[in-house]
């Protein structure tokens, strides 16, 4: 099982390959705001653990194992962003909040959050009811 740091790299590599068709060390470093040497070390570790295949100066490709995990990590991130929007978290805070919690939730918790997101999305009245509860709570606290 990948560590949270490994997950961040796999997720970013998956997104870059999906967007550009490839992922270079420099692109990964820029996206994660880390030094290229840190990326090289992690990519070598991910290669050793068979999440990707890395050839120096030639680039990297995700293995089927890496693609599967990358897809699941992107799903988790997007789902948590959806959840944050539904519960009314300010848009400017969503990314950092998701980054702060995504590695600490079990996949069972993610699946249950997915159920909850689906529940709210099936009927807009449910979201409106939640907004009413939130408004009432805000008025009580003021």
Swiss-Prot record:
Domain HTH dtxR-type: 1-63
Residues binding Mn(2+) 1: 8, 99, 102-103
GO BP term, example: intracellular manganese ion homeostasis
One GO CC term, this protein: cytoplasm
An annotated Gene Ontology molecular function: protein dimerization activity
SUPFAM superfamilies reported in the protein's UniProt record: Iron-dependent repressor protein, dimerization domain, Winged helix' DNA-binding domain
Pfam family, one: Fe_dep_repress
Entry keyword annotation includes Transcription regulation: yes
Keywords annotated in UniProt: Activator, Cytoplasm, DNA-binding, Manganese, Metal-binding, Repressor, Transcription, Transcription regulation
Localization annotation: Cytoplasm
Notes on how activity is controlled: DNA binding is strongly activated by Mn(2+).
Residues binding Mn(2+) 2, per UniProt: 11, 77, 99, 102
Domain of life: Bacteria
Keyword Transcription regulation: yes
Protein family (similarity comment): Belongs to the DtxR/MntR family.
Function description: Central regulator of manganese homeostasis.
Subunit relationships: Homodimer.
HAMAP family cross-referenced by the UniProt entry: HTH_MntR
Protein name stated in the entry: HTH-type transcriptional regulator MntR
Organism expressing this protein natively: Bacillus anthracis
